[in-house]
Amino acid sequence: MSTRPADTDISKLPSAYRNFYSACRHFIPEERIYSDPLRTLAFGTDASVYRLTPKLVIKVRNSDEVSRILGSASQHHIPVTFRAAGTSLSGQAVTDSVLLVLAGGWGNYSVSPDGEAISLEPGILGSEANSYLKSYSRKIGPDPASINHAMIGGIAANNASGMCCGTTDNSYKTVTEMKIIFHDGTMLDTADPASRAAFNASHRQLLSSVERIRDEIAADNGLSALISRKFKIKNTTGYSINAFVDHSDPIDIIKHLMIGSEGTLGFIAEITFRTIIDHAHKSSALIFFPDMDSACRAVMQLDRETVSAAELMDRLSLKSVEDKPGMPAYLKNLDEKVTALLVEVRGENHSQLEQKTQQVKKLLGEIPKLFPITFTDKKEESEALWNIRKGLFPAVGNVRRVGTSVIIEDVAFPLERLADATLELRSIMVRHGYGDAIIFGHALDGNLHFVLAPDFTQPQEVAQYESFMQEVCAMVVNTYSGSLKAEHGTGRNMAPFVELEWGAQAYRLMRQIKETFDPQSLLNPGVIICDNPAIYLENLKPMPQAHEIIDKCIECGFCEINCPSRSLTSSPRQRITTQRQIAALRRTGADPVRLQRLEEDYVYWGEQTCATDGLCATTCPVSINTGDYTKYLRFTSHGELANATARFIARNFSGVTTMIRSGLNLADLMHKLLGTPLMLRMATGTRSLSSAIPLWTPWMPQGGQSARLTGQTGGRGKPKVVYFPSCVCRTMGPALNDRDHRPLNQAVLAILDKADYTVILPENLDKLCCGMAFDSKGFFEAAESKIRELEKALLACSNNGEYPVFCDTSPCLYRMRQMLDKRLALYEPVEFIHDYLMDRLVFRRLPETIAIHVTCSSAKMQLGEKFKVVATACADKVIVPAKVGCCGFAGNKGFDLPELNAAALAELKPSLPGDCTSGYSNSRTCEIGLSQHGSISYQSIVYLVDRCSEKRPERVEDELLESTNWV
């Protein structure tokens, strides 16, 4: 952790910023204001191709803080920019001034009794909003591709949309009420008559300006017609001036103007949406046409009453994914002009679904197709089809040259012009050197995306991009009357072209809107309204080479939702951004002082607080595991002494674990003698002397026991299983306050015995380890020696993989699956119980409410559903806390860096109902932290299964027959 006080960095700022900082410090704690080089760089990064580094980053937690900050910003004339999840693509969430980041809080919501409306604070993810509506069979209208990662504030501020919502169910069309904070800090609640009346009195001049613009548009039939026509297709270029045509009340106009305003008119503190039906029944078809014209003619025949989505993919799009695992073989044999439509229909029931699929076939009957239309409602087959579409963007990210950026441009055309426009777009791409760029999009909306990968470190490629954009913009606007931005927002990227698309009169009114709402031009200046015609070519983000593990990162931020340290220190995207900067500074030698500062601060903010769980890779479009890079950094930092120590521990593993067990037993004895309060005070005082002393908590385990077979398990001719008790469970037993005080291996042997398995233990068990503890710390040599030692032992006792291997710890099993001989059939507790034991035991469901925690490794092995099945066989009510992912305990980090565990599990206790008295998981160290922060005992799922299962009666009879001495 950096030891430099914030004042060191603050003193270097211009005086206006120093004064602004001092004002904010009266109501924002110092730990939520960042001014150092690392965090301003890291938090300043978003998913766009632009890089601006803020002077200050402030984490805001509620509306009052935003209101007071805006008041101070107005007083000191300081520009501010709002940031939600940072997934926007057009440069609307970057700044070189003050960045306000939503952090903590902002998660309140309410659903109407019938589910037809939902009120949401801006920090809620789009997918979370839909989860709140799931029980009503409804969802929010806007459906951007980033819905699992984007926050409601950004979705609304950008009027973001996706495959299904079109122009009828986007944020603009479904917003009903809003809480808005204006440039002077004033709050307006449009649902509250008193707030509306107060605003009418205090901001009469603003409302009068809105009314004047409304009246001017209404008096000009040509302008009104232009606005209506342009918003018949998707359009996020400029402001939502259709608000002046669609509404007459000035506050209703303001409410709709805020949609798509990108933080330039005010801050959306809460929004209420009208929800839409979420049909459960879906069917998909991938339809191939001989050329683009045929595909676009097919789109013209479809409508949203019949089809919910129709995704267009040109031949280069299909080619980009044809070699990926799971892709259909026939993709490789298609002609170069072939174009595909991926169509989805939805219905309330199977009958309605069948009607719609037949209707699609009828509508497209006369249009030439390469193959007959075949729909599937099977989940796995539909997922295979949609993986083609989802794989397009990652395919480009994976094959681009190191150092290049990724740009996803976003245009829309009137549907009747789509075919010609697409072909002309392709010819422009070829002419400007982007002939390998793919084209895909939401065909029902005439909305196309195309992906470029320029190297903006090369001046000639910047010039190439400039000339390309000039020609594309002219073509979209002048030839086809299209939208330069359909759903990604104007930002900096399209700000210089707003007047080109809208014309002088409409653009003049947009300027008036900006001046009315932001008279000092302090709200996100340079976005939407901008006097700099070259802003889209300035401050282009460098993507310097750093290391092959992370070089493919496109900085989209999709990784961040899974990161346990994201609210404590940094996220995977921020780690990669920082490492790229460090690599560039090392290479150029340009700023040694800055380099040293970044390197020093990164130790805590980047390396030490990385849990290396790898969940970031599961949502990364290009599958980057930032944890692997962290382990590489740890590996490179080790000297010979550290490596020698690791090798010594690996060679003497049995003795080391015996010592740890003894230490844990001593601590447990002291806990029993002193009691929890006194022990806790003593342990806290001891740790205050040095952070190197592990943190003791009341859930610290006692020493474990090595597994021993005390008698015959199973009977003659019974199936065999190899049981490998992990070293962590051999070392760590239950805690004093745990419900079941047996060592885990005893519970495992008990359920295997009930299921009539003959159990085999590996020889020399006490020295065996999967090596994960070494691997996570970057001791790769020691880790490799332990995994190979284990491999040899398991092959021997499983008869070279003939018998399944049961490991009682999920993270260890995950590593074993990655590293061991593929002949071995390896299972962790949940999967083995689900696949092997549930039909061999009788379960009695307990009248209890329990919680389960799906560990990172279980999530990566996609065992979440099996975990639920096992748990629901055991208890009446099962809780899976929605906002709890990786626990952040990360081996020993829960002891050494308890703040990481606390940050990761901040939402655990609030998610547990009062009648939930126990929790279950499948990793001993994770269970320690879960118990501490959930305030209930978490133990292995094995204990629960043992408690509520019995032998099947027929197996009892078999045992009696076997044990009887017949005469």
Regions found by a protein language model. Give the residues of each.
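N-terminal glycine-rich flavin-associated loop
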Residues: 12, 24, 48-80, 98-144, ...
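Terminal amphipathic helices with adjacent charged low-complexity linkers/tails
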Residues: 271, 305-402, 437, 441-442, ...
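Iron-sulfur cluster-binding electron-transfer modules in prokaryotic oxidoreductases
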Residues: 518, 627-967
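N-terminal flexible segment immediately upstream of the FAD-binding catalytic core
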Residues: 1-71, 75, 85-116, 145, ...
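C-terminal substrate-binding/cap subdomain adjacent to the FAD-binding core in PCMH-type
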Residues: 155-157, 164-171, 175-390, 423, ...
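Activity-critical C-terminal alpha-helical subdomain
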Residues: 395, 496-545
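Cysteine-centered iron-sulfur cluster-binding motifs in ferredoxin-type domains/subunits
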Residues: 546-567, 600-624, 857, 884-885
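Non-heme iron-sulfur electron-transfer modules
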Residues: 529, 566-602, 623-649, 936-945
